[in-house]
A protein has these predicted regions:
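Conserved N-terminal Rossmann-fold NAD(P)-binding element of oxidoreductases
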Residues: 4-8
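Hydrophobic/small residue at the entry helix of a nucleotide-binding pocket
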Residues: 12
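Helix N-cap at the beta1-alpha1 junction of Rossmann-like dinucleotide-binding domains, i.e.
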Residues: 34-38
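Rossmann-fold cofactor-recognition segment
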Residues: 46-58
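Conserved Rossmann-fold cofactor-binding substructure of NAD(P)-dependent oxidoreductases
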Residues: 56-68
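N-terminal Rossmann-like NAD(P) cofactor-binding module of classical short-chain dehydrogenase/reductase
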Residues: 70-75, 95-96
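Rossmann-fold NAD(P)-binding glycine/threonine-rich loop
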Residues: 99-128
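C-terminal catalytic/substrate-binding lobe primarily of soluble NAD(P)-dependent oxidoreductases
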Residues: 150-409
């Protein structure tokens, strides 16, 4: 029987805690956060839950909460990542992170290399497994990209495309952490081009797609994300030698943030306004609503009215098969807001990221990780990929694959 510590009881952490509460192999789900009220509210809904207040800025606080656990699930903001990593090593337990902290080094790329190298060695030395990038993107989308490789002899280019078209009458530009969203959108993006990791301008290099299930052609642009880094670093071993890997993002959040960026309002450099020094980024962030996470909050937004409830997650892998150039299109279908709320009382963002994140946790619970050390979500074995996608289907998340001649997109 497993004991799991879930650090951070926001959208992702709370969803994972609820999923693990239903797993027969789980004896206890320890829910930890600095916000005691949020912890108490979550624990009230669980059969196996226990709450604890943790100050994640202090490693010893995490270590104390992790005593005797089999796994730490890190659903905290990125700056806490180094403390949680070190606490997992000190507690000699397995580790799962929805993201990949950018706080280990000044350069995020070097930080990920450090995790693949030094941290992987340290987890392997204690016989434990750590996995990063375990939400929907990164996470599910990485698993889908790996599955696409089965249909290619060699891969040239991978597009990881995400379009989020959800719009409500209530002002809600982001359905996840506004801080994370704006931080991503205020930075240069990453791409893997001609076999090298490069920085690209945010909102640049647009692509346009018309998918059958969307009512219009959509635009997706460069966006700072993990996938080109993981897949680029692992291209030779896991992605059939792909030389070009992109993450493209579009939808309501991009439409909201791009004009702000052009106006300089996502800058973190102080400017003088009427004799006062202000940071534009902080001013914008201060005026954004938090993502809804409680059932009554979500219900109120739905009752006020939903203008659009659509989206797309598509991996396009271009390469060679039997001497012919082909494209493998993998379309992910998942519940939108209304269906997610009907199924689980949560938002579509919570459903896709939290539920799909919990499937990486389930691989731990089922003792399916054979790897020791630190891996990312694109490095699963074929057996792990099969189990993950089968469980995803049980949650209403499916993948439709089309292999067709490549004529350019």
């Amino acid at each position: 029987m497993k004991k799991i510590l879930v650090l951070g009881v926001g959208a992702q952490g709370s969803t994972t805690a609820r999923r693990m509460d239903d797993e027969p192999e789980v004896a206890e789900v320890i829910c930890a956060d600095y916000d005691q009220k949020a912890v108490d509210e979550l624990v009230k809904t669980l059969k196996k839950g226990r709450g604890v207040r943790v100050d994640a800025s202090k490693r010893e606080s995490i270590v104390a909460a992790a005593k005797g656990v089999d796994l730490i699930v890190n659903a905290l903001p990125l700056p806490f990542g180094p403390n949680v990593l070190e606490a997992a090593l000190e507690a000699k337990t397995n580790y799962q992170d929805f993201a990949a902290t950018d706080a280990l080094t000044k350069d995020w790329v070097e930080g990920i290399k450090l995790m693949y190298g030094e941290y992987s060695r340290r987890f392997a030395e204690i016989g434990k497994t750590a996995i990063i990038g375990t939400g929907s993107a990164p996470g599910l989308i990485c698993v889908v990209a790996r599955q696409a490789m089965r249909y290619l002899d060699a891969c040239e280019t991978i597009y990881n495309n995400v379009y989020e078209g959800l719009e409500s009458k209530r002002f809600m530009p982001f359905w996840w952490s506004p801080l994370t969203a704006l931080s991503d959108m205020s930075e240069e993006a990453y791409a893997f081009i001609d076999g090298e990791i490069v920085r690209t301008a945010a909102f640049s290099m647009p692509i346009y797609r018309k998918y059958d299930y969307l009512d219009k052609e959509v635009k997706m642009v460069e966006h700072a994300h993990d996938e080109p880094l993981y897949m680029g670093m692992n291209s030779e071993k896991y992605f059939k030698g792909a030389k070009n890997i992109y993450f493209k993002y579009g939808g309501a959040g991009i439409d909201f943030a791009e004009p702000l960026s052009k106006a300089g309002l996502l800058s973190r450099d102080p400017v003088e306004v009427d004799g006062q020094m202000v940071v534009p980024f902080n001013v914008v962030l201060k005026h954004l609503p938090s993502a809804p996470k409680y059932k009554e909050e979500i219900q109120a937004i739905i009752d006020e009215g939903i203008l659009c409830d659509s989206g797309a997650m598509v991996v396009e892998a271009i390469g060679m098969k039997d001497g012919k150039r082909v494209i493998v299109e993998s379309h992910v279908f998942a519940p939108g807001l209304l269906e997610a709320f009907e199924r689980a009382g949560i938002t579509a963002e919570m459903y896709l990221t939290g539920q799909c994140g919990s499937l990486f946790t389930k691989l731990f619970v089922k003792d399916m990780y054979t790897q020791k050390g630190l891996i990312s979500s694109d490095m699963l074995t074929d057996e792990q990929i099969y189990a993950y996608l089968k469980w995803a289907e049980d949650l209403g998340v499916s993948v439709q694959i089309e292999v067709k001649p490549y004529v350019g997109v």
